Curated annotation (Swiss-Prot):
Family from the record: Belongs to the MEMO1 family.
Name of the featured protein: MEMO1 family protein PH1626
Cited HAMAP family: MEMO1
A Pfam family per the record: Memo
């Protein structure tokens, strides 16, 4: 089974242009690490011109800490297709950078242990949130000279129960199978403006990015404290438009079980820095959790 690119040439470039863009993001890449303390990372999934540098900070940190065997990648299901909790079952994903294999045994073990997820490829067919993470992973894996595998998971249902179930199931499955694993939670933060039908505050255009950041930081602080319930409480209180809290929550639970003690915000920006549009502002953050 092969999953071909759905958004190459749209969210990110193809061919030499992709390599050039990734190289520019990673021009400050340090030496490959061997500590392997990172348990989970958060990265955005907008077009690379908006959020690519922010996403690269997560993968730079992983490269300099040490690569895992498997990346379990969560992404919100924007298309509504397929199962509401869907793990890609087997085969490989194709990108302009080449192919990357799915750890089918790991995926099946997570489904078996969770009791709430399905093996389903349809949910992934056109979804961009996981696809845009892969060139970053392929780039650092090639730099390290290693082959890594992935377990892609799309979420159409995102709440504390789903996060707890999947975070624990990934921990149990990875322990049972002996998989060295990092969770990647693909998410953007606030989607502000008339374009998104979400205008909880108003201000001059130049003021809005800082206002968006202030609201996003209420959630980010909870993530940095490994506070799953607090994160969802803040989201509900603000009616916040963060699109991937379920994957972040699973990363929090998994990291707790892995005895992670520290989380760090590596980079934050908004789409306004590029678009200058006050009618559609999205927040982007790079976060890591580590032992």
């Amino acid at each position: 089974m092969r999953r071909y690119p759905a958004v190459a040439g749209q969210f990110y470039p193809e061919g030499d242009a992709l390599i050039e863009m990734l190289s520019s993001f990673f021009k400050d890449l340090g030496e490959e690490g061997t500590k392997r303390t990172i348990t989970a990372g958060v990265a955005p999934h907008a077009g690379y011109v908006f959020s690519g540098f922010t996403a690269s900070r997560t993968y730079k940190a992983i490269y300099e800490d040490g690569l895992p065997e498997v990346f379990v990648i969560f992404g919100p299901n924007h298309t509504g297709l397929g199962s509401p909790i869907a793990l890609y079952p087997e085969g490989e994903w194709i990108t302009p950078m080449g192919s990357i294999k799915v750890d089918s045994k790991f995926a099946k073990e997570i489904v078996k242990r969770s009791g709430i997820a399905d093996l389903d490829d349809l949910a992934h067919k056109y979804e961009h949130s996981i696809e845009v993470q892969l060139p970053f992973i392929q780039y650092i894996a090639e730099k390290a000279g290693v082959e890594v595998k992935i377990v892609p998971i799309t979420l159409g249902i995102q709440d504390e129960e789903v996060s707890r179930s999947l975070g624990r199931s990934i921990f149990e499955a990875s322990t049972s199978l002996g998989r060295d694993t990092i969770i990647i939670a693909s998410t953007d933060f606030m989607h502000y403006g008339s374009f998104y039908g979400y205008v909880p505050f108003r201000g001059r255009p130049e003021e809005l990015p800082n206002m968006v950041r202030d609201w996003d930081m209420r959630i980010i602080r909870r993530i940095l404290d490994f506070d799953l319930d607090g994160m969802f409480s803040e989201i509900r209180e603000m009616n916040h438009t963060m699109c991937g809290p379920g994957g972040v929550g699973a990363g929090i639970i998994y990291s707790r079980l892995m005895k992670a003690k520290e989380a760090e915000l590596l980079h934050y920006t908004t789409s306004f820095e590029v678009s200058r549009s006050p009618d559609a502002i999205v927040g982007y953050a790079s976060i890591i959790m580590k032992r």
